[in-house]
């Protein structure tokens, strides 16, 4: 039972087999469906607590019918809005008092949506919501220097074989990688000079740790 973690099912393409497996072992107290994410929820037999978006993909009428049957809350917006549907879902998660959100359907479709979701993770983090984006091959989250809980990587707990760190800020200062196949000591990296320095690292032993002094990193745990 994950009391302070909600699930956001976004509208991007979702590997149904993976999603079914993912939600099977996790009990979320609150589920937010984002537009076409409603179709995924429907297939998985997940009843959302809230459906958010303009429903230009899922269809407003279809959404209204389903809502009558299942009785969840909705937050409907016009398509000409300034925020993406996932952004609206993040705001809803914060309003509902959650500190962590697992997000499905945020990757693998339109690249503009995928990149905006990664930028959204930063705004969400600043507002107090830690987002973890999952798909069949990746777990993505952001790291700041004070994230002690997320800076230790246990080999039998990570999502896949590889751990990559990409700078989200222009520079990230003082990176030390301990227990990784490719270690670093107090290294400053920048998007311009080292865009791929910390990609595809591995953990040969039981655990590894990252520390750094300043900046924000995108962490991707991935499997082939």
Question: Predicted regions span which residues?
Answer:
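Mobile, glycine- and charge-enriched loop segments
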Residues: 2-7, 30, 63-78, 205-224
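General beta-strand structural signal in soluble alpha/beta enzymes
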Residues: 9, 32-35, 53, 75-76, ...
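Short glycine/serine/threonine-rich phosphate/pyrophosphate-binding segments
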Residues: 16-18, 83-87, 110-115
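A glycine-rich helix N-cap at a beta->alpha junction
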Residues: 69-78, 128-132, 158-164, 172
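Short phosphate-binding loop-to-helix
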Residues: 73-96
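Long, charged alpha-helical interface segments
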Residues: 138, 143-224
